Amino acid sequence: MTPDHRFLDDVTETSTRVDPALFIDDPETAVWDESCDVLIVGVGLAGACAALRTAEDRSIDIIAIDRGLGGGASKLSGGIIYMGGGTSAQKEAGVEDSPENMAASLSFETGTLFRPETVVCFARTSTRFQPWLESHGVRLGGPASDAKISYPETASLYFSGNETTALGRALATPAQRGHRAKPSRGGEPTGLSGAYLLPPLLASIDRQPNIRFFRQTRAARMIVDASGEIVGIEVLRIPKGLARWRHALAYGMGTNMIISALRQAGRLHKIAVAIEQARARPVRIRVKKGVVLAAGGFTYNRVMMAKTAPAYLASVPLGTIADDGSGIKLGMTVGAGTAMLDRISAWKFLYAPASWTKACSVGPDGERLVCEELYGARTGEAVFEKGGGKGWLILDQPLQDIVVGEIAVMKKMLFQKIQFKAIINDYTASATTVEGLAEKIGVPADVLAATITRYNHDIESGAADGMAKSEKLRRKIEAGPFYATSIGADLKLSPIPALTMGGLVCDEVTGAVLDPDGKPVPKLYAAGRTAIGICSNYYVSGLSLADCVWSGWRAAESLKGHGGAKGLGK
């Protein structure tokens, strides 16, 4: 075992400090406070799925720990799970799909990151996500939507990725695969559906006779024997009493969207951390079969991000303060390898309104920025990687009128109403000429004029779009005045949220964490955003949560002795 301590000192005021692994001579004679077969670090969707799937074998004793109350970033998410191949919801809505068709579609996102057979296995396994989740109290189903939307207002099954784009259609037949969780007590969702997805799973965990769920408990260091094999873990747990109650209140309120919007979350985070530091007590847990690291990514650790992905520091972290890289660091202290730590998924959606995709996007150099109809993660990547955090949509008066009209009639959640008002009134510039518009937004006038001229000429001449935009979305930008709507990262009321996509390297079949030489680290598994996953190359809505289910199941099947992904057909 060769420990890697590169990031141990990269902490913020809300981070969990991870210490180097503790070596002990003999685990059998050591003093332990608790003992289990399997220990799961982090109980978001990945950890919850790993715990519940492992618990199906009643002979396995499980302890699951979470820094907060459980749910993690998954509970704060849109609650979309990307699954297909013929799910119950798809069949009920008349959506035709197959595992092979889904895998072909996903190849646009996964690229060469995973073997084709792994992507097919993921697609085939996803057909079983729905009944399993429903068995634990989650509600899923239709109706389906045919619209091009970033997040559905009423539909619960929609095109959540690049399925309907020209590039997507070239690979597979489009099918709605974004499944939105519904309220467990009935009715349709009225808010972000992560709040409907996680609570039933957490309640199910509490009902399992062979799972002990230690809330308000954070992992501090791994414990290994003289050979370097994992034999336990040391955690810091807040004892019962007033401190635990106060911590739960501060931690929970700190994740509230309204409180965050009012910029009061930071104060609550500090209260929670102060309680952790003052009152948490060390607990040593003996682990016999294995550890699953499912503690999220590191989007809230801006010190770590400054080293790995500095271009994305202007993004807004999506998750909780527990997304601090602690799970990744724990793995590294026992020799785990990492990859793609510079890979960030940052989202800037150009739909809805759908007609924004008919505009021409440009960067600060005045050149075309991105294919406007692609999923928001591709746009966000272009804004940061090509535009240095800046970008605009260029529209003419007729197109601007259409966009404003679409915004007026579309159904919007409260946060969307606030965003659109700011975008139209505060984040859009106008001028009578393209050159005048360029001067207002600070891009080279000659380059912007040439970009728009070329864009229009290709449409007039029948030439293919330079970025493969669908023909139905192409229209000339020629009737002034002209408009530039900012899609940059500096918009307070329309920020670009981001998740980290890199993490521990895992075996595609077993979920075992690998060292830098590609050898398994004994008794160590990882899931969700602590690990490289199906969504790590390119993310689309629901793919991270789907990977949480998949990777959690995979680790569980390995711990049950079923060979990881090989056991997912059982």
What are these regions (language model features)?
Residues Y82-F122, E134, G141:
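Glycine-rich active-site loop/strand segments that organize a redox cofactor
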Residues V447-I534, Y538:
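A glycine-rich dinucleotide-binding beta-alpha-beta segment and adjacent secondary-structure elements
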Residues D10, S15-R17, C121-R281, R302, ...:
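Conserved redox-cofactor binding core of oxidoreductases
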Residues E56-G78:
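Glycine-rich FAD pyrophosphate-binding loop
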Residues V38-A64:
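N-terminal Rossmann-like FAD-binding beta1-loop-alpha1 element of flavoenzymes
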Residues I328, G337-V443, V447:
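An anion/pyrophosphate-binding glycine-rich loop and adjacent beta-alpha core
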Residues L192, G241-F349, L545-R554:
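Glycine-rich loop(s) and the adjacent beta-strand/alpha-helix scaffold that form part
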Residues M1-V38, E56-D57, H269, I534, ...:
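Extreme N-terminal leader/targeting segments of oxidoreductases
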